[in-house]
């Protein structure tokens, strides 16, 4: 089995190779790194790919030195466009080490019989942390107070003063109880709140077991 790992400024090919060998054992690994001329160019191209798809990026030409006899391609943010997919005659799997597959030409891969996988839940902890952070910021008017202080004002009353305060014993409703919803509920337990869940696809026993 031959695996091509394609790194970028956020996740190097060395780290991808180490992960592949940890999971698959002693397989043959080829490494390529996407190295735009500057950080600014990388973030610009990444944004273009997010909005317009893999054809908007500029993947490294070194990919074509290896892709012809590769079984698996592992990428992070590097665009895998139709040209790369077409050249990957033996490839059967493309794995994206991210939550989405915006940087992979899924239609071209499907046409060629290549399965495309992404990393579900990769950013779930970050999203759940941020969700709780927003709850605290809203209840404690952190953002509003910061803005007032920057203007030299010490404001004591806010429009939501009548119904905010401590998190303690608040009722919190979660719409959706997938992986992120589970994490939010788990992290909220330390605040001693009552959690209400709505998710037509969730198993009632699973919700109860989560507390």
Language-model features: locations:
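Rossmann-like dinucleotide/phosphate-binding beta-alpha-beta segment
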Residues: 142, 160-211
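Phosphate/diphosphate ligand-binding glycine-rich loop within oxidoreductases
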Residues: 7, 69-150, 164
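Short, polar loop motifs at secondary-structure junctions
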Residues: 10, 78-79, 199-204
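Alpha-helical segments flanking ligand/cofactor-binding loops in enzyme cores
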Residues: 64-65, 107, 186
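Acidic, amphipathic alpha-helical patches
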Residues: 60-63, 81-84, 160-163, 210-211
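Short gly/ser/thr-rich secondary-structure transition/capping motifs
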Residues: 52-58, 75-76, 151-158, 209-211
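Short, hydrophobic beta-strand segments that form beta-sheet elements in well-ordered domains
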Residues: 3-6, 31, 73-75, 94, ...
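N-terminal glycine-/charge-rich "phosphate-binding" loop or analogous flexible N-terminal tail
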Residues: 1-70
